[in-house]
């Protein structure tokens, strides 16, 4: 059992009056307490039990429990339910129904558009549910939905196991997995959701569901998005052996204009097309500078990797190589800032290659070159992601590249200008005919977001699950799956 238990959580929130859950905290299998008993019509659950603490806006601890990673999200729920068990989640749903409140779900709080919060409703915060257990024989990891990636890595890596996922340390495992989950190792092993073997969930009616009894829930949880029709409490995922080594290089080019940036991007697309599955690359433009990241868990002198390094080094102003180190030492290099931050990030679509994005590049490059704080990035996908046969709702396996547009600021004036620039980049992307987007990089301005994130057929299937699991549309956000009809 990991040290990241509910007891750890309560120590850190004791100032909020959270000396609750006292009995449950010592349990070794904390999520599987008896189901919450039904309440009489109109009755409210107690404000504090061993399973859940309801925080009002005036309570100490509310601000910390509400805080999203995106500091610009100002939504303020009426109450935040800090849930330590499935029974606590059930009690939270009971209160939401009694108060007729909408429900949002918060784990890591990294939703770009603040979908883990709402105004005047209830937020079910599962961050106390952070127990981790690794079966040493099967390599299966059972994790509470509130676990963060840093905790997962710190738990698994010393045991010689690894879960392919993203790199941001404070991202919640639940949200990452449900939306897909990709990173530097997805080309080798597939998406995080491809490793999902089972889950437990409290649906919108307050009923505990197990994917062993409802296989369509497992299908939906493999890339079908977050906050639609249930609150995941526990995930079981297949881990991998830790790679023996990790190598990385950065190639930097300075003082670029549109012509040189386009030429460098064309060379990058050509070089990445030949990379082995062990390798990952990202092309990142910030102002007039481009940084290209290359990583591999395979041989550093593998033919295609060596060719990539030679080709990109010849076009770059500076090349640097990190020491070859175990993954336990290299992962923290990519953890990113702890947050919160002021930003506006959005999916910039999936591509098959340069031709798909070429028409949008002049407009994108103009914005990035003239607006400090803007970043345009393209990441390699493909590899095992394209070959994976696991049944799931993630629909974009055939596209080997994923773009993202990012803006960061520290003053309101810059926020307005950069948000407008992101909007223009989004328009350039749409006019180029790019319509597929990653659900974990949402944007409220996407017009046909159901098709963009999930595809039409998958979305209709998700709607059928919504109708069964949340017929009152209790769990919702601006881009949650709608009830059919």
Protein language model regions, located:
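Soluble FAD-dependent oxygen oxidases
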Residues: 2-485
